[in-house]
Amino acid sequence: MCGIIGIVSSKEDKKIADKVISALKRLEYRGYDSVGVASLDNNKLEVRKAKGTVEEVISKKKVSEMSGYIFLGHTRWATHGPPTDYNAHPHVDCSGKIAVIHNGTIKNYKELREELQTLGHVFKSDTDTEIIPHLIEEFMKRGMDAYSAFRNSIKTLEGSYAVLAVIHGEKRIFFAKRDNPLVIGLGEKENYIASDIPAFLSYTKRILVIKDGELGFITTSNVFIEDKDGNPVDLSDRVRVIDWDVETASKEGYPHFMIKEIHESPKSIRDTVDSLISDLDLIDKIIAEMKSSGRIVVVGAGTSYHAGLYFSLLLSREGMNSFPLIASEYYNFKAKKDDLIFAISQSGETLDLLQAVRKFKEEGARIVSLTNVIESALARESNYKIYMRAGPEISVAATKTFITQLISLLFIYSRLRRDNTNKFRGADTEVERVISSVEGYAKLIGEELSKKTSIYYLGRGMSLPLAMEGALKIKEVAYVHAEAYPAGESKHGPISLVDKGFPIVAINDGEITDLLRNNVIEMKARGAKAYVISANKKISESDVEIYLDSIQFPALSISVVLQLIAYYASVSKGLNPDKPRNLAKTVTVE
């Protein structure tokens, strides 16, 4: 969940500090509590760090005044040790000549720390990361050169990591990766390495993805990588040119990334559908696997789980043996050799999902992945890879990536049923029409719901996953407690909480309208205030109803309405929906 950036330049320059600052700001969406920067020149290694926001730390520590030919930057999300100045990265060794930044969890850090302490090493933080510079120092004391010392240090670590290290006297950045994202940007007389592409997108579009178990170093003009067995890697076919631009990763006049990304949903749908249609051979191979599999297990976390639940319900309606699985509960499930796993993740780096996939692969299952990031860890673990084309999503709360997950899964389902998939060409215009026509109403509902302390979100059939996602969104960004459940379960307990003014949000996709109407009437009889989002058929018993007429893709259209409601509830409370407290965009620790 930490953000990482490293820059190595051919000349010593304060302008590199400005690039690091810019990169750190682009990494803020990952969630963090402290910030730090290291610079290296011919004379010294300097570290400045503190608890706080990027702006606060940059100003307080005068980071823009730092100079050097190598820089490291880090935004920390606390896992080992509280968020403090001394726990912020980078961490250094006893001599102050080695600096390290790290994302991940070192499982054997306590044993290594104790061993290093017996050798005389002094630690100044509570973090697991700090053992790494001390390990490098210890191996160099024993006569190893810098790279050998780094390699041996990495080999002693158990757990997950994306590590960058600099050593005084070395004009290169050392790196290692296991389970956490790390990508290289190739510039002119300057190279970059970061946890996310947007960190260096202003300076280069040429990237090189580092695979699990690899380590190496970058200089101003060279990249060296060796695999987990120590063999040099041929990089000739690794370099890719990405088609994102800087504007795509900026707010473009919107007050927040979240609302910008909701409005980008139509374009994301269009790009994703174009990609799916151009790759029908892959889709048909996946469908053949689905038909021949004994079970189809759809795995995801958070928003991705809700998309997976929607897909699993569709497959169950076709008589297929399918069920959804929350990624973090993977240890309760044993895969079989004829199982097909659908793994869904926006980032492709969610650790509990990766652990689930690796376990199921070992048990003989085949993996289909759906992700927004090309060559992500999840994609590399998969037999079949489907890429959404949502573009970068900066806001922590998933919006357009949920929509592109749904459109991708609906496309596969339609292809499975041999429906005409040309209808998907119109999905973008339908969602665009819904956003423009209902945003004002969604704003009013959001403002009302922002004043509530608890809300029920109700759905039946295919509306249930949408209700669950709507409840999650308003919890995430507006800090309002919301519970989603099948509307038919109301009399089995939940209705006991309903009294005068209690808000319910009923999701009606037009399939099971009559039964849902009865549930709304029951709630209103106990004093509830009913808000209804309907597609194609009205409930007409609500206090407030947003009605979407002539809708071909109710899941998409209803979802953007629920996202708008959550966004305006957040803004109404004066909150920043892009950075919900205690949350991060990508969960890469257990």
UniProtKB/Swiss-Prot annotation:
A Pfam family per the record: GATase_6
BP term (GO), one: fructose 6-phosphate metabolic process
Active-site residues (renumbered): C2 (nucleophile), K585 (for fru-6p isomerization activity)
GO CC, any one term: cytoplasm
Principal EC category: transferase
InterPro entries named in the record: GATase_2_dom, GFAT, GFAT_N, GlmS/AgaS_SIS, GlmS/FrlB_SIS, Ntn_hydrolases_N, SIS_dom, SIS_dom_sf
Known EC number: 2.6.1.16
GO molecular function term, any single one: carbohydrate derivative binding
Protein localization: Cytoplasm
Keyword Signal included in the entry's annotation: no
Domain Glutamine amidotransferase type-2 intervals: 2-221
CDD domains from the UniProt entry: GFAT (cd00714), SIS_GlmS_GlmD_1 (cd05008), SIS_GlmS_GlmD_2 (cd05009)
Ranges of residues in domain SIS: 286-422, 445-580
Keyword set, alphabetical order: Aminotransferase, Cytoplasm, Glutamine amidotransferase, Repeat, Transferase
UniProt KW Secreted keyword: no
Domain of life, per lineage: Archaea
Catalytic activity: D-fructose 6-phosphate + L-glutamine = D-glucosamine 6-phosphate + L-glutamate
Assembly, per entry: Homodimer.
Cited function: Catalyzes the first step in hexosamine metabolism, converting fructose-6P into glucosamine-6P using glutamine as a nitrogen source.
Protein name from the UniProt record: Glutamine--fructose-6-phosphate aminotransferase [isomerizing]
Phylogenetic placement of the source organism: Archaea, Thermoproteota, Thermoprotei, Sulfolobales, Sulfolobaceae
